[in-house]
């Protein structure tokens, strides 16, 4: 029987330090500063391992985490910003006993229910991820929670400061930790060893200073790492996962190729999937066709820079794109998938604009746009990616049966990830009220017929 009132009991909180006596100071780049005051990204990975004991689980995870932090020293440190004359930096000091806080918990909940696709209260996931302490002058970088489900398995909750890690760095760290735990060795494959070089990120236009000035202005003209307040999530918000198979994506792609007259469209899995989700979201809301919708996404820029950054570059290297004033009317248009095709064509234009010359414009635009945006405007954005390979995080007990980005309930995001079964499909996560879940689900299904 599904337990919808599951309790999570905190058993202990331990500090896990890397076996290193070296100190480290790593300044933030403008790629990091764009996300400075946004809420952390919370992920939870579910593992079905009925025969596992709590003592063996915690012992292996603690020792392998310590070994992994030797390569990922910044994650054991703190984000510090104590003077208006300096910029924020990540500081790790063994003398200050810097460490990652690992929470050990136990739940009487139903792991299969939590890791399913069906509607589940979004608040059920909040107790599976740890808090990240933040003050004006200091913020923890990473916190981890292991929740043991007796005779079922465990969940691994990871809370990461958005100004320190993007999705690619988070996925790289998780796969490195999993590798160390499974192989019981400290050596990592080359593609899981992070590059901490900051000199390679050039700032010819002074974008760092412009971003810092805007954050200082937003904090009563003083440096502050305190985050923007997060939306309070009620019990009426449900988390649901929808799936597009490889065949679904192929059919949607063929529909665009047949019906669109535009040339050189971007028909990647991301564009097809996100365009389809945008269409369903806008039609779900309905309303005045002359209304505007805010639509955005972020792209990895490591390979787009000249010269490019290494694929293993540690930190943020993502830039947002989109439009705060997308007209709903063309997307609401009925007949032959016209709204979906409009969304594909719109996304194509934004993807084509992903170039180094547009970085500053794209990173500064939100500061002005949010000031003039009226309350209640529909917002659609993306968390995650189908290219992160997050389901490859095998700690020795098999791959996760489900991965959820918990924080999509705070900011109207949808989450995208590769299908956990390796079939080439896409998992789409949404958090909506019950009536909206029913409308969105109906639109999602009908559009694939």
UniProtKB/Swiss-Prot annotation:
Pfam families named among the record's database cross-references: Transferase
Protein's name in the database: Malonyl-CoA:anthocyanidin 5-O-glucoside-6''-O-malonyltransferase
Tissue: Expressed in flowers. Detected in leaves, stems, roots and siliques.
EC number: 2.3.1.-
Species of provenance: Arabidopsis thaliana
Record key words, sorted: Acetylation, Acyltransferase, Transferase
Residue numbers carrying N-acetylmethionine: 1
GO BP term, example: anthocyanin-containing compound biosynthetic process
pH-activity note: Optimum pH is 6.0-7.5.
Comment field (misc): The glycosylation of the coumaroyl group in anthocyanins A6 and A10 likely occurs after malonylation of the 5-glucoside by 5MaT, which could explain why this enzyme is more active on anthocyanins A3 and A7 than on A6 and A10.
Molecular-function GO term, any one: cyanidin 3-O-[2''-O-(xylosyl)-6''-O-(p-coumaroyl) glucoside] 5-O-glucoside malonyltransferase activity
Recorded phenotype for the gene knockout or disruption: Absence of malonylated anthocyanins.
